[in-house]
Amino acid sequence: MSIKGIGINADSSRIDGNLEVLREDLACFQRAGFDYVEIPVHGVDAILNGRLNPRQVKRVKEVLARFDLQYTVHCSDWLNLMDADEFPLHKSNFEASIEFASEIGAKILVYHSGRVELENEYLGQAALTRELLSLPDRALVSEQERRERETLAELADFAKERGVTICVENADPRVDEEALWELARRVRVKGIDLFYRIAPGGDIALYNYGGMISRLVEQVKGVGKENVGITFDFGHAYIASHYYGFDFLDSIELARPFIKHVHVHDDFGRPAGVDRRQIVLISQGKGDLHMPIGWGEIPYREVFSRLKGYEGVVLLELKPRYRPYLEEALQETRRLLAECGVE
């Protein structure tokens, strides 16, 4: 068997609801030789207050139909089934995302793994019942993970009727939130101490299970649906492996039976801090840079060698600033896939 093809992401911030920009980008992607394009449901304004926007969806479909391309869909980056404050809205957004994927003939729908947002804990409704620098306890996090599993199982049935597979994407570390979490834990355990370093510790990635591939695998296993798998984002996993201290290549092997979609891009394995501006991060080699492969340090020869037998889409997820290098990036990806026996 062979891969379905090589794709590229349509950038949500670049499109920002402007379908003329989408049209221009699709024309560019087709000229470059891509087979698939990943459409961000939030970038094309397909959902309005948790419901499909039929007027806009009609216009989107008219644009997509002009091109000899196939499509996958990315849910809103904001979508989070572990957000207790806004759960009904997140669920309805997810249902609308499935409907959108079905409308445009996409078989794959990417969803970022859920997380307990620390800013919600301190600034949202939950903050009214929490002490300063208290932590959401393990029971609360476990309950939100359980609800996400049950909801994904329910949504999987809805998606199956429409020919859609849900692919849960692994996360990269959010160092600013990790530091807040760890500081709160240490204050509770040790009291105020200004001389210890903030670093991953006791409750490592508790609030954000998708950063740990082993926990993501367990979550997807727990859903127990054939059409719920993993989007393995190699860039995210490479950063997370350095930050959390797990073996990057071993994590691919662990997730391999559940991988139904992949995101391919490069970085240096160093997490960003609070300042996530690309103009700052690029020169420092930090953060989720979304560069073409070969620009960073991810060992893609070893990565692709572990994808033999993979039958999905290989999706390049690049920042718009790398547009001049699209054809080069596509050719390099094809070459390396072929050398590794993944074609």
Annotate each PLM feature.
Residues 49-51, 84-86, 121-123, 179-181, ...:
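Short secondary-structure transition/capping segments
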Residues 20, 66, 83-229:
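Active-site acidic/histidine proton-transfer and metal-coordination neighborhood
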